[in-house]
Amino acid sequence: AGVLISPMFKPVYGQLGTTFGGNHLACSAALAVMDVIEQENLVENAKAIGDYLLEELKKFPQIKEVRGRGLMIGLEFEEPIKELRSRLIYDEHVFTGASGTNVLRLLPPLCLSMEEAKEFLARFKKVL
């Protein structure tokens, strides 16, 4: 793979020595991502949907502790979550993460809609 640079950028020895950051392509991509985050109000969406999920998840007596911020959520259980994660992925097609043996991690995209959040809760309830 290669990158073409406009003649308006004068390459200087050592300026383009990294493939993972600080180059013009990476900077342009980062700026484009920041534009989308701002234009689509993704930070505000993450807070609103995250607050909703946190409140709804606290209603499940099977969960020992609900913690998180925005759409980065951890659900601590008394028992190991391996079987719960298997049921979520295989039966309900819901992908989750884990932290240790007893914490289920939720890390959905910032563009998660209220409809999708409610769908997750319905599927989650089915496997508990």
List where the protein language model places each region.
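Conserved N-terminal phosphate-binding loop of PLP-dependent enzymes in the Aspartate aminotransferase
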Residues: 1-128
